[in-house]
Structures are given as structure tokens and as C-alpha cells.
């Protein structure tokens, strides 16, 4: 049966083995168990990338990238909410830290790597300026309203929103993200299509069948689910390693966010390497918008039900780096063409973000 499937066997076997290992009673193996889970985690990430590309090829742009962004974000939100409900008061800043880490990884790390790889291989790459402008408008608004404005409101002291303000911010986030999805998929779908596909072999390749795409879609969800579960299972070991290294505990959130975003990051990297920068940017911007546009409303609902106070406002250091990232992204993408220098600058900002976490 598997031989007749137009899918590599490893993309089916590894995620299933990961699920078996996760629920099997072999945790007593200690470091060997950690190594097994880590290996299966990497394999599941690679399998997720393959299945995402199959689905994206079948449904076309921008639906393929939107599907991957939504799938990962829904699982990410589920992970955050579950940790908040079980972690108690110590997790009040979890959503903020995770969202900030995800946005910085996407804006500077993922995008910077794509621009660098594409610039080195093709010197210049083109994309649709209209789609990126729409994405940045929506992303900037949500980031300021949810991560920066809470520091300056007076209804509640500190980096917090009052319950009414939190509900209002959640509704605004949903409105902005909903308007973005409507624009991307219905009103102005052409904004998010590559400016020219004549030289793109992938654009002319035979798309997979509906059966293959459906199977890949199911396997994609299976892969993403086990990636998040394995990341959660490995979190204590990661936390111990970070503490033993003398690094701040906040670095754990960055590591987990990076693991969860690996499927999208690898898919974006491969697209840029194949001279499909539009796909890379659709993935990056769509992921950032979905991450914050869906996480904040979900966290707001949890806060209202449990009475938990949610920390949203970021500190001045993070604010400076976030605004710098947005400013550089706008300058880098304002012409519809990119080169390796812009990628290098974004990666430098990403390195600075990581460095200031370890050495604040």
C-alpha cells in the first residue's frame, strides 16, 4: 500500500513512530529517551515540511501558506493555553514571551535567512509589493496594540490591560486578522501571487492528486501535533540545560518557539532557495499575523474565564528591537526587490535579540 503512495515512506513512518515513542513507557531510559525524542522531533519537522509543500502545491498560492500558518498557530495556541491552565500564576507572561519570540524569529531570523540565501544564489529576488504592504500594515497595528500600548494605559498599573481593555484588544486583533485573511484569499488574492512564474519549474510541475493532498494534509496535522507535544515534553530538559549554562529562563520560551516554527522556517527557506521569495514572505508574514492575531484572543478568553491577570506589555529593550525590526523590514521590502545585504542586517538584529536575552 505504501509503495503505491506518491509520498516518501519516511514522511509517514517517522511521525507515527514519534507518537508511539511519546506515549510509550520508556521514559526511564534517561538521556537515551531524550535523544530518541529529539531525533524523532527533527524527523517530524522534516516530514511536516514535505507535507506542507504537497498541500501548498495542490491548492496553490496563497492558500497553501495560509493553511500551514493556521495549522501551526492553532497548535501553538493550544500549547500556550494548556501551559497557562496548568502552570498557574507563574505563566502570566507566557503568551507575551511566546508571541514576542515567534514574531522576532519570523521577522528577523526566518525572513533574514530567506533574503540572504536568495540574495547569494540569485543576487536579486522579486515579490509582489502590494501583498507585503498589506501584511505589514496589519502586523504593525496588532503588535503595537497588544505588546506596546499596555505599558501606557492607566486603567491598570504595569504592563497589563484591564479586563475590558483586554477584551477590546482581543476583538481588534480578530478584526484585523480576519480582514487580512479576507484580503489574502478573496478580495485581493493577486496581491500575494508571485509577480512572474515563467521561470519557476515548480509552477509548471504536475500538481498532486486530491487523494495525495488530503493524505498530506492529515499527515501535516499529525506531524505538527507531535512536534508541539515533543517540544513540551523536552521543555524541562531544555530548561535544565539553560539553567545549568547560566542563561536566563526566558531563553526556554525562545527555544520552544523556534522548534514549533521549524516546519514553517524550513518551508520558507526551501522556497527562497528555489527563487520563490513570494512564498517565503507569505509564510513569514502570515505566520506572524496568525501567531499574534489568534493567540491574544485565545489568551483573553482564558483570562476572563479564570480571572488570571495576563502580562502583555514588553519592556523597553524589547520595544526598541521590535520597532527596529519593523522599520528595517519596511525599508528592505519597499521596492519589491531584495538582496543579501538586507538579509544580513535582519540576521544581525536577530542575533542581537538573542544576545540581549542571554546578556541583558
Which residues are covered by each model-predicted region?
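Hydrophobic alpha-helical segments, chiefly the membrane-spanning helices
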Residues: 1-360
Amino acid at each position: 500500500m505504501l509503495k503505491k503512495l506518491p509520498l516518501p515512506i519516511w514522511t509517514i513512518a517517522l511521525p507515527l513512530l514519534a507518537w508511539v515513542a511519546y506515549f510509550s513507557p520508556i521514559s526511564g531510559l534517561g538521556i537515551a529517551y531524550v535523544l530518541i525524542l529529539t531525533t524523532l522531533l527533527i524527523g517530524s519537522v522534516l516530514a511536516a515540511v514535505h507535507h506542507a509543500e504537497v498541500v501548498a502545491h495542490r491548492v496553490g498560492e496563497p492558500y497553501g501558506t495560509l493553511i500551514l500558518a493556521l495549522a501551526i498557530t492553532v497548535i501553538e495556541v493550544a500549547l500556550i493555553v494548556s501551559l497557562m491552565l496548568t502552570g498557574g500564576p507563574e505563566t502570566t507572561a507566557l503568551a507575551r514571551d511566546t508571541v514576542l519570540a515567534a514574531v522576532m524569529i519570523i521577522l528577523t531570523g526566518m525572513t533574514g535567512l530567506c533574503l540572504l540565501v536568495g540574495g547569494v544564489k540569485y543576487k536579486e529576488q522579486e515579490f509582489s509589493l502590494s501583498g507585503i504592504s498589506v501584511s505589514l500594515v496589519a502586523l504593525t497595528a496588532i503588535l503595537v496594540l497588544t505588546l506596546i500600548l499596555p505599558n501606557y494605559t492607566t486603567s491598570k498599573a504595569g504592563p497589563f490591560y484591564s479586563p475590558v481593555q483586554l477584551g477590546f484588544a482581543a476583538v481588534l486583533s480578530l478584526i484585523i486578522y480576519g480582514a487580512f485573511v479576507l484580503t489574502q484569499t478573496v478580495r485581493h488574492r493577486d496581491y500575494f501571487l508571485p509577480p512572474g512564474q515563467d521561470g519557476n519549474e515548480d509552477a509548471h510541475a504536475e500538481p498532486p492528486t486530491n487523494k495525495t493532498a488530503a493524505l498530506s494534509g492529515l499527515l501535516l496535522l499529525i506531524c505538527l501535533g507531535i512536534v508541539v507535544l515533543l517540544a513540551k515534553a523536552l521543555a524541562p530538559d531544555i530548561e535544565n540545560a539553560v539553567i545549568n549554562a547560566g542563561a536566563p529562563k526566558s531563553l526556554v520560551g525562545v527555544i520552544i518557539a523556534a522548534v514549533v516554527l521549524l516546519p514553517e522556517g524550513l518551508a520558507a527557506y526551501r522556497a527562497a532557495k528555489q527563487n520563490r521569495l513570494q512564498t517565503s514572505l507569505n509564510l513569514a508574514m502570515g505566520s506572524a499575523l496568525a501567531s499574534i492575531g489568534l493567540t491574544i484572543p485565545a489568551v483573553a478568553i482564558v483570562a476572563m474565564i479564570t480571572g488570571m491577570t495576563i502580562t502583555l506589555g514588553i519592556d523597553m529593550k524589547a520595544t526598541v528591537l521590535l520597532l527596529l525590526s519593523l522599520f528595517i523590514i519596511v525599508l528592505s521590502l519597499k521596492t519589491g526587490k531584495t538582496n543579501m545585504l538586507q538579509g544580513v542586517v535582519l540576521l544581525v538584529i536577530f542575533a542581537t535579540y538573542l544576545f540581549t536575552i542571554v546578556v541583558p
